[in-house]
Amino acid sequence: MMSSDPPSLRFGQVVIGPPGSGKTTYCRGMQEFLSRLGRKVVIVNLDPANEGLPYPCAVDIAELVTLDDVMDGLKLGPNGGLIYSMEYLEANLDWLENKLKLHHDCYFLFDCPGQVELYTHHNSVKNIFAQLSKWNFRLTAVHLVDSHYCADPAKFISVLCTSLSTMLHVELPHVNVLSKMDLIEQYGKLAFNLDFYTEVLDLSYLVEHLSADPFFRNFNHLNVKLAEVIQDYSLVSFVPLNVQDKESMMQVLRTVDKANGYCFGDLEERNLQAMMSAAVGADFQFSTTLGVQEKYLDATKNHVEDEVMDL
């Protein structure tokens, strides 16, 4: 039986995103970063496919169910096995509650599976997050996306659609993160300045750039409508991140703390100046993005918008 008496307020992040986006690396980096700031951090691994974890794990779903056991026992593939594992966890939430009760006055990082369908179409993960909220967790969904997708307009529109769908389905305060900023131009230069992608500015320019490709020109009407849906909701924006960069990590942390209310919570002493700074957004997002662009983008290459201005 799950307790009807919820514990005191607890804060944390649920780290989601497609496979290979850097969720586990982010959890390890954020744990080290928060520990240096004096926060007591607990990592909860909710990914049954995670093996050889690079961080100390306080709660591990592998004690309850593993993907290999599910695939072998039920003859399921990787996707079906992950869905079954999440349904099994949902049916055994008392196990998770008892594990979490052992950790008091901690900040929680939940390392989640990478299957996109779990956050856009299936309800088990959504229900697990909802139950965590009932247990007095104040969580922010940190959705990691590979930054190099910005170099491909078609992939970036797909990323925007996935991010929007996830935000609407998961129903948590949401921070979208462009991860691996040090590799952003690995597969080609960006067509626009970085703030165009982080703030998701006028997508009609991106659609025009996409229609220059003969293949995608055939799908121009579809791309226009997808861009309209994204901009009509006006929900998606991104925070750039390089886990090795302390300033970048601090920017993400500030955004997350505002989203879940940690900066106004009672887990540690916060002075009035820090709270007011968070409330008015005194970290100036534009200046931060400009600094990231200067650090990671090749300044010798002209962007499309620069070339247009030169005409």
From Swiss-Prot:
Biological role: Small GTPase required for proper localization of RNA polymerase II and III (RNAPII and RNAPIII). May act at an RNAP assembly step prior to nuclear import.
Motif stretch (Gly-Pro-Asn (GPN)-loop): 77-79
Gene Ontology molecular-function annotations: GTP binding; GTPase activity
Domain of life per record: Eukaryota
This protein's name: GPN-loop GTPase 2
Species annotation: Danio rerio (Zebrafish)
Keyword annotations from UniProtKB, A to Z: GTP-binding, Hydrolase, Nucleotide-binding
CDD domains linked: GPN2
SUPFAM superfamilies recorded: P-loop containing nucleoside triphosphate hydrolases
Gene coding for it: gpn2
NADP as UniProt keyword: no
Subunit structure: Heterodimers with gpn1 or gpn3. Binds to RNA polymerase II (RNAPII).
Protein family (similarity comment): Belongs to the GPN-loop GTPase family.
Cysteines engaged in disulfide bonds, as pairs: none
Residues annotated as site: Stabilizes the phosphate intermediate: N79
